[in-house]
């Protein structure tokens, strides 16, 4: 661990990003630890294919910011690696067996598709396990979260209902930010 005063003066991008988080939460002098007791950082993973260098890079970069943050200010942090495993399969990856079988599941949630490798409950579960194994080999400090589990547990229900109830207000905010070519409502 480096000295806090030194960490606050470093110009490397992870430290600049960490300082932005601190600034948005009261600054160095008035920083308040969030009510949950930690600052949360998150990475996302779309398990429609096997983990790759881009997946690794996202976790590395976020971990660098997390470590810089912890060097600058005394506040617990948590890194969540969130798997969007309810996403639909858009195309069959080139580097998997049983491609013909997977073709039948285009558009289906990744955790509802049989594992073409025949090792896990689903293709999504297989790729999630690969990611966790990959991250564990490099000793990343993270918590893995599956969107399938979150949906099945009802963890998103309140937010989804809130979105439905405020749909028009949300559109009023979002639509002006979209290019006209993207609007198909």
Locate the predicted segments by residue.
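Short, solvent-exposed turn/loop segments enriched in Gly/Ser/Thr/Pro and often Arg
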Residues: 80-87, 147-148
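Active-site cores that bind ATP or allylic diphosphates and position pyrophosphate for catalysis
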Residues: 136, 140-183
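Short catalytic/ligand-binding loop motif for oxyanion handling, primarily in non-cytosolic enzymes
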Residues: 49-51, 86-90, 152-155
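Charged, often glycine-rich, active-site loop that binds/positions anionic groups
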Residues: 86-103, 159-161
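Di-metal (Zn2+ and/or Mg2+/Mn2+) metal-binding site signature of metallo-dependent hydrolases
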Residues: 53-60
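Non-catalytic terminal extensions that flank enzyme cores
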Residues: 1-53, 67, 71-81, 97-103, ...
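Two-metal-ion acidic nuclease core segments, chiefly of the RNase H-like superfamily
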Residues: 122-134
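A glycine-rich helix N-cap at a beta->alpha junction
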Residues: 101-120, 134, 138
């Amino acid at each position: 661990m480096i000295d806090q005063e030194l960490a606050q003066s470093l110009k490397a991008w992870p430290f600049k990003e960490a300082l932005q988080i601190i600034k948005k939460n009261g600054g160095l002098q008035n920083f308040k630890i969030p009510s949950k007791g930690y600052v949360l950082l998150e990475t996302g993973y779309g398990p429609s294919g096997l983990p790759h260098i881009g997946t690794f890079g996202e976790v590395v970069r976020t971990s660098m910011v997390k470590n810089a943050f912890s060097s600058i200010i005394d506040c617990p942090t948590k890194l969540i690696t969130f798997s969007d495993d309810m996403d639909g399969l858009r195309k069959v990856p080139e580097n998997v067996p049983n491609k013909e079988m997977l073709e039948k599941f285009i558009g289906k949630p990744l955790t509802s598709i049989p594992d073409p490798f025949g090792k896990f409950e689903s293709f999504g579960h297989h790729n999630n396990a690969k990611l966790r194994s990959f991250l564990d080999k490099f000793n990343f400090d993270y918590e893995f979260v599956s969107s399938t589990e979150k949906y099945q547990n009802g963890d998103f229900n309140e937010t989804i209902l809130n979105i439905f109830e405020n749909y028009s207000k949300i559109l009023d905010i979002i639509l002006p930010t979209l290019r006209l070519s993207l609007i198909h409502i």
